[in-house]
From Swiss-Prot:
InterPro entries: Palmitoyltrfase_DHHC, PFA4/ZDH16/20/ERF2-like
Domain comment quoted from the record: The DHHC domain is required for palmitoyltransferase activity.
Entry comment describing in which tissues the protein is expressed: Widely expressed.
Catalytic activity: L-cysteinyl-[protein] + hexadecanoyl-CoA = S-hexadecanoyl-L-cysteinyl-[protein] + CoA
Encoding gene (name): ZDHHC21
Residues of the DHHC domain: 90-140
A Pfam family the protein falls into: DHHC
Top enzyme category: transferase
Compartments (UniProt record): Golgi apparatus membrane; Golgi apparatus, cis-Golgi network membrane; Cell membrane
Family, as annotated: Belongs to the DHHC palmitoyltransferase family.
The protein's name: Palmitoyltransferase ZDHHC21
Record field: transmembrane: 17-37, 45-65, 134-154, 186-206
Organism: Homo sapiens
GO CC aspect terms: endoplasmic reticulum; Golgi apparatus; Golgi membrane; plasma membrane
Catalytic site: 120 (s-palmitoyl cysteine intermediate)
Amino acid sequence: MGLRIHFVVDPHGWCCMGLIVFVWLYNIVLIPKIVLFPHYEEGHIPGILIIIFYGISIFCLVALVRASITDPGRLPENPKIPHGEREFWELCNKCNLMRPKRSHHCSRCGHCVRRMDHHCPWINNCVGEDNHWLFLQLCFYTELLTCYALMFSFCHYYYFLPLKKRNLDLFVFRHELAIMRLAAFMGITMLVGITGLFYTQLIGIITDTTSIEKMSNCCEDISRPRKPWQQTFSEVFGTRWKILWFIPFRQRQPLRVPYHFANHV
């Protein structure tokens, strides 16, 4: 299965994603500079905590980049529909193309996406069948990284021993309080927003319902049999191996194939 790169030309989305990258860079540069490395050098924390911080940061960035550039499940212009599966397809009244049921036409991107959940400006891309798992990983690692950074910011002032060796000639130490206050504000704001989003995403997967279906009061779930949560998560992540649900470096293998899209997934 080849990786399909997908770019959305949207200045609003670029600004939103740029803000996310700025927050990530702000924390990945300043938190270690002000908190982690000084306390490590004075023996207050073990080095493994710094490795964990950078590990979570890398996973978060990889999930962000891949969720942004991975094709969410754009439908081809002339799909081949097997005769036995035509009942599972419908005609889009906006682009006049045949699409599998539960697909949706994204007005911002201008095409239909398989099992589209929503269009997310923060990744400048749709969240659909092929990149939903990356979006979930992004939510998870963003929340984990935010909690980690807030925890160290709190411990820096209220738990760790005061630093004895600080070069006050450096900008970051002269303006430490302002920098840490801004980091705490961004962290709390990010944590509140991402927690609500992550919760709704998990509920949607457990109930096998997309955000668009919830907003449109779709009644398909009445006729659709309820699946075990392990099955719905396995379909989203493309594997039944739960440990792989947390790895953003791999390729997703589709488990949900009610229609023939092996070379489009």
